[in-house]
Each structure stands twice: as structure tokens, then as C-alpha cells.
Amino acid sequence: MKYEVSTHGHRLEAIGAHSGHRIRMSTLSAQGLETWPVSVYVRGSESEAEVKVDVPRHHLASPTEAFDFGYQCATLWIDALDHRRT
């Protein structure tokens, strides 16, 4: 599994990792939503602050689709960051 999902009231949160970075994503769980917005944050280590990853607007029909899209955006962001360092 790429990430683990937990529920906090109306908010769903997923935590995952890629190349030593922590990925945190969140979306809303409310009935009647036509699209599921996703927010994505990445942190390199526990001592670093989280950085918000800009996620393009996209029609996401389910929380799984939202988290998969958010995870894909985060891994692309991390890989681009790692590439600039080399």
C-alpha cells in the first residue's frame, strides 16, 4: 500500500512516503460531493517544516482517486526536487 488512510470527522487523511520523504494528503468526506478536493504536503525529515505541493485542479470522483492523484503529484514533486540536487 502506498499510504494509510485515517478519518478525522469529515476529513480523510492519508500518510505515505517516497524516497525518504513523508507525504500527507487530506480530503473531505461529505455526502453529495461531486468532486473530492485534495491537499498535499511533503516533509523531508521530522525536523523540517511541511511544504505544500501545488496540485492541479482535476475532477476526482472518489477519495481513493483523490489520494492516488495527490500521491502521484507528490512523488513527481519529490523526484524533481531530488533531480535538482544532483
Label every PLM stretch briefly.
Residues M1, G16-S19, S39, E65, ...:
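Intrinsically disordered, low-complexity segments enriched in small/polar residues
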Residues R11-A14, S29, E34, L60-T64, ...:
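Short linear sequence motifs
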Residues H10, V42, H83-R84:
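Short, intrinsically disordered low-complexity segments
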Residues M1-R24:
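Negatively charged, low-complexity tracts enriched in Asp/Glu with abundant Ser/Thr
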Residues G16-H21, T27, R57, L76-A80:
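Terminal alpha-helical segments
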Residues E46-T86:
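Mixed-charge, Lys/Arg-enriched low-complexity segments
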Residues I23-R57:
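A short, structured beta-strand/loop element
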Residues T7, R24, S29-Q31, A66, ...:
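A generic structural micro-environment signature
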